[in-house]
């Protein structure tokens, strides 16, 4: 064994061994308990960042630990390879998205291997290959036949200059990112999957997810947004159709003083024909894309349509306004406004001088003061005719019943969740497998024409999708009739919604999934990824699993038992102000800093002499130039050091502050372990451990070893507090380094301890542990070695700590044998100098003894 720890030599050698032996390749084995450990697959952007490294290190630690418990562990990896960034990069680098993507995959795959992750590479998937997306296309056609897929018009961002659809991220300050033309909203036909058909089950089954973070479940509950209310129909004077609204507060119905419709509503469109102000307003709304999150804070605007609706219970005429806070794609595109009891309605009514009618009493029974804001709390009705005096629930039921009786209302359960729009007007995605005949009939692509392959050898102009620009690509025949292929591609969330299942059978050619393999491995035991995926990916992931279950492919209801959301990686951020007042962000690697006695940064400059402003720790990002390249750190310290720091610096679900001093500390610790093993093995062969022959000191050290095994096992397995597990191993190492190494049993005990330490560290630092296990004479590869088991007998304490009090005040602590008698404890207490001085010249009047815990001497 060489004296110096040289990670660059060890790590490449061990990685080659894993590759040659195919150590982490697994197959279904009914005789073994399975464990499926999965990290969210990366987008092949070109280089791994520290967020990736953290995510995948957590997964690898869990997978290696479960493997050492004797389980059949599947840990696969792949590439979420479609998406818009590839199109931009292809234009910029004068290439096509496919070669750019495949080059990135090759580079990042090498990076993952360099970090020593124990993946089953035989199951690697790239979602941009026809071998993968063909099954997704086939599944989509089956969903269409089941009535779970439909086409309708929906609004998109449209650049009139480039004549193309823009993704939200391509709209900068309302203008096209390429030509700076003002972007319009345009209605075009798009494909949707009926996720709303599963809304109830998606909501209900959240209760089954005991090992998912509450925050994620709450976000999904709110996103699905189930509510119970009443759908009410209004007649409108001079308008051929009725208006339907939905409300969760029918108790306030007698206070409705206006209706509001979306700018795109047919009523508003009709009214605009004779109303220039309304026409201009509709135009303004059409070209303003409002994210739902911004709806609450934006300025409320509207125009009176001139139409009057008839209140179904009072017969009063109430105005119908077009308003920018009503969206056509939500509900019916019309809402009932009760400004006395809804703050948004109140602000709008106040702005435009509309009637505000209170119908709910304040909590003290008085009429509410509506001079400054609406009363939104529930309460007792007044000003409501026959419903006066009713509290919320009774009023809800009475008004709902009355509306139903008159045939103008019915109780409804509503969802905030909308159907999933899967059409994207991009090139780099899986083609949607639908065709249109010359007579306009829309059909799914016949199975014998699947997959519909996306051509990869294309020229990108940065404006139009190559498959839209080439009229020949769309031409096909179905049943001998000419047809045109759909030129939209799938939302890339489609690919990431079922990849976890395909990992169970990536080579299967008979269908989307081999049910036998899928049901052996599924559900995933632990799924690791960022909380930013809580409502999009993680909802579609759950939805797709239920679709596959209902297609008979899987038997479980949910795709993953446990979800672990790792925290973000933060780093110091610095900038200097440029000549034009702009901020120039400087990498923390290039910042020369001065710190105070507490280690806080007080001054910083860069190599060019710029005084730097330190903004504290923030998420590693390109915009702040504070990302740390994992490759550089691995080359400097080795993969094991980077992995150990990642797992030690912070609990897995909390933010991690990148500190190179901490990385250096992790490196020093690995060197200490190496040094101790080197010194130990250099002394030659070791005798067998004779537990019965150990001295008290040796027994105490062995007790520490086995207590550490018990703690680390619990910390990694049950609690998943990996940082405290590492801290416990470090504490044990400090004791082992001080332990005597001369006697035969000293060395035998150290051998047992070091073999345990190396196995406990193996999930975190697998390369160095692989090597040290061999040096310590461990049987076989450490990858197949069992996890150390704590010896219950070794952990039994033969001494205990007794607190000694004199007249109720603590005067000392003594160590006594577990089976010591009261007399022996009193005698030992008298020998303790801190206690003895309080007993000089006094009489002990009473003794209170709690065996093994407390001795209280009452003196006088």
Curated annotation (Swiss-Prot):
Gene Ontology BP term (one): leucyl-tRNA aminoacylation
Assigned GO CC terms: cytosol
Short motif ('KMSKS' region): ranges: 619-623
Cellular compartments annotated: Cytoplasm
Major subcellular site: cytoplasm
Signal peptide: none
Encoding gene per record: leuS
GO MF term set: aminoacyl-tRNA deacylase activity; ATP binding; leucine-tRNA ligase activity
Family membership: Belongs to the class-I aminoacyl-tRNA synthetase family.
Reaction(s) this enzyme catalyzes, per UniProt: tRNA(Leu) + L-leucine + ATP = L-leucyl-tRNA(Leu) + AMP + diphosphate
Positions that bind ATP: 622
Tree of life domain: Bacteria
Database matches in Pfam families: Anticodon_1, tRNA-synt_1, tRNA-synt_1_2, tRNA-synt_1g
This enzyme's EC code(s): 6.1.1.4
Chain location of the short sequence motif 'HIGH' region per the record: 42-52
Organism of this sequence: Salmonella newport (strain SL254)
The protein's enzyme class: ligase
Record keywords: Aminoacyl-tRNA synthetase, ATP-binding, Cytoplasm, Ligase, Nucleotide-binding, Protein biosynthesis
Protein's name according to its UniProt entry: Leucine--tRNA ligase
């Amino acid at each position: 064994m060489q004296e110096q720890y040289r990670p660059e030599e060890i790590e490449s050698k061990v990685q080659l061994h894993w590759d040659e032996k195919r150590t982490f390749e697994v197959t279904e084995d009914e005789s073994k308990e399975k464990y499926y450990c999965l990290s969210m697959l990366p987008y092949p952007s070109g280089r791994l960042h520290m967020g990736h490294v953290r995510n995948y290190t957590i997964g690898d630690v869990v997978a290696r630990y479960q493997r050492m418990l004797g389980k059949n562990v599947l840990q696969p990896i792949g590439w979420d390879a479609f998406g818009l960034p590839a199109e931009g990069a292809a234009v910029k680098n004068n290439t096509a998205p496919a070669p750019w993507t495949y080059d990135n995959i090759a580079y990042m795959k090498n990076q993952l291997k360099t970090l020593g992750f124990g993946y089953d590479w035989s199951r690697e998937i790239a979602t941009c290959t026809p071998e993968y997306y063909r099954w997704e296309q086939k599944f989509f056609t089956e969903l269409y036949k089941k009535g779970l897929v439909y086409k309708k018009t929906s609004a998109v961002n449209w650049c009139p200059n480039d004549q193309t659809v823009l993704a939200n991220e391509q709209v900068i300050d309302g203008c096209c990112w390429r030509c700076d033309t003002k972007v319009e909203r345009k209605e075009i036909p798009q494909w949707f999957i009926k996720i709303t058909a599963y809304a109830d089950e998606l909501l209900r089954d959240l209760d089954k997810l005991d090992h998912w973070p509450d925050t994620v479940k709450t976000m999904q509950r709110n996103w699905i947004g189930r509510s119970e209310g009443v759908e009410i129909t209004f007649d409108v004077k001079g308008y051929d159709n009725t208006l339907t609204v939905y409300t969760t507060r029918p108790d306030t119905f007698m206070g409705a003083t206006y209706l509001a419709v979306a700018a795109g509503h047919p009523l508003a469109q009709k009214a605009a024909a004779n109303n220039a102000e309304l026409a201009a307003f509709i135009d303004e709304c059409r070209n303003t894309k409002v994210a739902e999150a911004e709806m609450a804070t934006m300025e409320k605007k509207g125009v009176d349509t001139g139409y009057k609706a008839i209140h179904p219970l009072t017969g009063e005429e109430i105005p119908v306004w077009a308003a920018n806070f009503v969206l056509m794609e939500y509900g019916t595109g019309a809402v009932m406004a009760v400004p006395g009891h809804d703050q948004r309605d109140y602000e709008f009514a106040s702005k435009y001088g509309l009637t505000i009618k209170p119908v709910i009493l304040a909590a003290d029974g008085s009429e509410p003061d509506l001079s400054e804001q609406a009363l939104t709390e529930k309460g007792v009705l007044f000003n409501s005719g026959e419903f006066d005096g009713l509290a919320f629930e009774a009023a809800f039921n009475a008004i709902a019943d009355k509306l139903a009786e008159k045939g103008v209302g019915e109780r409804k359960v509503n969802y905030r969740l909308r159907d999933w729009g899967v059409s994207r007007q991009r090139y780099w995605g899986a083609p949607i497998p639908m065709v249109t005949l010359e007579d306009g009939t829309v059909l799914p692509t016949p199975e014998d024409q699947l997959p519909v392959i996306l051509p990869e050898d294309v020229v990108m102009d940065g404006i139009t999708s190559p498959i839209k620009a080439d009229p020949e690509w769309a031409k096909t025949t179905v049943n001998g009739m000419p047809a045109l292929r759909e030129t939209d591609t799938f939302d890339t969330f489609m690919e990431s919604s079922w990849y976890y299942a395909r990992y169970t059978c990536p080579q299967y050619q008979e269908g989307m999934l081999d049910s036998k393999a899928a049901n052996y491995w599924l559900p995933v035991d632990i799924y690791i990824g960022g909380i930013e995926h809580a409502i999009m990916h993680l909802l579609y992931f759950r939805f797709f699993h239920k679709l596959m279950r209902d297609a008979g492919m899987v038997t479980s209801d949910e795709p993953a038992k446990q979800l672990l959301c790792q925290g973000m990686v933060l780093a110091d951020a610095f900038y200097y102000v440029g000549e034009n007042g702009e901020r120039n962000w400087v990498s923390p690697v290039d910042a020369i800093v001065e710190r105070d006695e507490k280690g806080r940064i007080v001054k910083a400059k860069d190599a060019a002499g710029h005084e730097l402003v330190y903004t504290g720790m923030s998420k590693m990002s390109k915009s702040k130039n504070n990302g740390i390249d994992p490759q550089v750190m691995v080359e400097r310290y080795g993969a094991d050091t980077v992995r150990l720091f990642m797992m030690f610096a912070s609990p897995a679900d909390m933010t991690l502050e990148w500190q190179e001093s901490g990385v250096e500390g992790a490196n020093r610790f690995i060197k200490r372990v190496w040094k101790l093993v080197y010194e130990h093995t250099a002394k030659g062969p070791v005798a067998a451990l004779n537990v019965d022959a150990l001295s008290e000191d040796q027994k105490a050290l062995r007790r520490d070893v086995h207590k550490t095994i018990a703690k680390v096992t619990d910390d990694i397995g049950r609690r998943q507090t990996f940082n405290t597990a590492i801290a416990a191993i470090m504490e044990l190492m400090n004791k082992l380094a001080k332990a005597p190494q001369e006697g035969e049993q000293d060395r035998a005990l150290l051998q047992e301890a070091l073999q345990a330490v190396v196995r406990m560290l193996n999930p975190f630092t697998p390369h160095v542990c692989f090597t040290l296990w061999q040096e310590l004479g461990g049987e076989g590869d450490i990858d197949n070695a069992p996890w150390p088991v704590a010896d219950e007998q070794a952990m039994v304490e033969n001494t205990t700590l007794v607190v000694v009090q004199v007249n109720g005040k603590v005067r000392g602590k003594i160590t006594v044998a577990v089976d010591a008698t009261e007399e022996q404890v009193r005698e030992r207490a008298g020998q303790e100098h801190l206690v003895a001085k309080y007993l000089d010249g006094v009489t002990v009047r009473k003794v209170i003894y709690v065996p093994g815990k407390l001795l209280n001497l009452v003196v006088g």
